[in-house]
């Protein structure tokens, strides 16, 4: 995890794996002019056991969830440009890929949690919206550094 680079602020969560489609509450825009839903909640596929328990120095939380307090954060480099965006949810995952992952580690996740996760994968996610934010985030970072974007 990116946060792990910054002073071991990541742990294996004692409550086990966070898997399936989960709501993520955005406390602020992850990128300038990001269009947040009216309730500031987006649904993403989660697939993790590690969690950030303390944000790195200089990081700003942008999101939390019922399973992970630090579900998203941004971090500036020493020149003040936001160049790190971390999200606990996976906008790049789809239901098929997540089902295959669940099949491969069901014994670690547990039968009940796996069953609930599989059922949740039928829900619509906001992955396309979040992917647009990620693209915008890095486009802005590149422009601020004078890189072609």
Go through each PLM region and give its residues.
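Short, small-residue-biased leader/transition segments that mark boundaries at the very start
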Residues: 1-6
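Post-Walker A helix-loop "phosphate-sensing" segment adjacent to the P-loop in P-loop NTPases
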Residues: 7-11
């Amino acid at each position: 995890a990116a946060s792990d680079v910054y002073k071991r602020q990541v742990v294996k969560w004692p409550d086990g794996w966070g898997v399936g489609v989960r709501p993520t509450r955005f406390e602020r825009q992850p990128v300038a002019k990001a269009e947040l839903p009216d309730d500031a909640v987006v649904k993403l596929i989660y697939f993790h056991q590690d969690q950030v328990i303390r944000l790195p120095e200089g990081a700003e939380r942008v999101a939390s969830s019922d399973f992970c307090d630090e579900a998203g954060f941004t971090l500036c480099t020493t020149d003040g440009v936001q160049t790190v965006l971390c999200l606990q949810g996976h906008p790049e995952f789809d239901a098929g890929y997540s089902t295959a992952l669940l099949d491969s580690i069901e014994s670690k996740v547990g039968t009940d949690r796996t069953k609930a996760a599989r059922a949740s994968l039928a829900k619509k996610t906001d992955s396309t919206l979040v992917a647009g934010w990620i693209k915008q985030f890095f486009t802005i970072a590149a422009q601020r550094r004078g890189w072609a974007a």
